[in-house]
Amino acid sequence: MSEKGRLFTSESVTEGHPDKICDAISDSVLDALLAADPRSRVAVETLVTTGQVHVVGEVATSAKEAFADITNTVRARILEIGYDSSDKGFDGATCGVNIGIGAQSPDIAQGVDTAHEARVEGAADPLDSQGAGDQGLMFGYAINATPELMPLPIALAHRLSRRLTEVRKNGVLPYLRPDGKTQVTIAYEDNVPVRLDTVVISTQHAADIDLEKTLDPDIREKVLNTVLDDLAHETLDASTVRVLVNPTGKFVLGGPMGDAGLTGRKIIVDTYGGWARHGGGAFSGKDPSKVDRSAAYAMRWVAKNVVAAGLAERVEVQVAYAIGKAAPVGLFVETFGTETEDPVKIEKAIGEVFDLRPGAIIRDLNLLRPIYAPTAAYGHFGRTDVELPWEQLDKVDDLKRAI
């Protein structure tokens, strides 16, 4: 069926958005613990509201000093984001920080530490000894629409959000404040992006800024035009784009004073902008024994290599686990009719090339490292500003040989 005139929209938010503050805090705590003890088991949730931060969850770690220093870790990340004054609605130096972290459940730990394969089935392979930390299903996706093999709407929305933060932090637009959102609507014909239809940019700003005379033209020139100038997708027509800057009017009250924030509430922003399916599990604050995170990363790794190998123009891969089991209970590959090889053969090749047991994913992607804080904003996938192991194209030749 023709898709002429169909519009698809994705959004992004800046690191100063209340939910993203929480993701950043949770991942900063995770990184601090992993840096001191790579075997730390971490499940940390954060809530922010006016003048307060609450950090709760479960942890098992030998990193006593890092654990004791969590309050300072929290404050440092808030200040780095840019909330350093009550004039901005939040101050990392003076806000209240409440820590309520307990120990990891031994019932969960037993299934992770000694998987069903080792405990019941007598498996001798060390990688069979680590079970999945929970049941669940995870998706990965890749498409040849952008150099980073991401859907164009979310890729463009993230570029705009990153640019908003960049012009604030480097002083190009010093009156901007940390909270902000972007939204991109693109017109598609036969599943190909052809026209940039609408861009929405909402940003927190100082109280004395004139929206019509200052904010709107500045955002168009310093944010939108800069991103569009760098847009590699040459066939995208941006000549008639509708631009909406702060369409509600002034945006002075932002951050935790404007809205409470919570870890894990931006899972579509974190992944594929709604273009691909999502298994439901959030990422931030979770160590890689949690397959919600590590297996979703592995699925992106799989999907990206499949597309890069030329086996399909776009692919979505699902994996599923049972708690306490090492081997996945299911693997499903969808190529949307864009495959160059039989999808059954592609699925078989994936099974031969990628070891999707949790212990193997952690080993192959080297996940027991403090690499997670940068992922807390601007997406976990398709990043061009940081190097992430699940974005590497190291299995292309292996997949071609397996086919």
Swiss-Prot record:
GO terms, molecular function: ATP binding; magnesium ion binding; methionine adenosyltransferase activity
Record region (Flexible loop): 104-114
Binding site for K(+): 45
Pfam families: S-AdoMet_synt_C, S-AdoMet_synt_M, S-AdoMet_synt_N
Enzyme class: transferase
UniProt: L-methionine binding residues: 58, 104, 259, 290
Binding-site list for Mg(2+): 19
Cofactor info, note text: Binds 2 divalent ions per subunit. Binds 1 potassium ion per subunit.
Reaction catalysis annotation: L-methionine + ATP + H2O = S-adenosyl-L-methionine + phosphate + diphosphate
One GO CC term, this protein: cytoplasm
E.C. no: 2.5.1.6
Subcellular localization(s) per the UniProt record: Cytoplasm
Alphabetical keyword list: ATP-binding, Cytoplasm, Magnesium, Metal-binding, Nucleotide-binding, One-carbon metabolism, Potassium, Transferase
One Gene Ontology biological process: S-adenosylmethionine biosynthetic process
Keyword S-adenosyl-L-methionine: no
Cofactors: Mg(2+); K(+)
Gene3D superfamilies: 3.30.300.10
UniProt binding sites for ATP: 17, 179-181, 250-251, 259, 265-266, 282, 286
InterPro entries membership: ADOMET_SYNTHASE_CS, S-AdoMet_synt_C, S-AdoMet_synt_central, S-AdoMet_synt_N, S-AdoMet_synthetase, S-AdoMet_synthetase_sfam
Family assignment from sequence similarity: Belongs to the AdoMet synthase family.
Role, per record: Catalyzes the formation of S-adenosylmethionine (AdoMet) from methionine and ATP. The overall synthetic reaction is composed of two sequential steps, AdoMet formation and the subsequent tripolyphosphate hydrolysis which occurs prior to release of AdoMet from the enzyme.
HAMAP family recorded: S_AdoMet_synth1
Complex formation: Homotetramer; dimer of dimers.
Protein's UniProt name: S-adenosylmethionine synthase
Source taxonomy: Bacteria, Bacillati, Actinomycetota, Actinomycetes, Mycobacteriales
Gene name per UniProt: metK
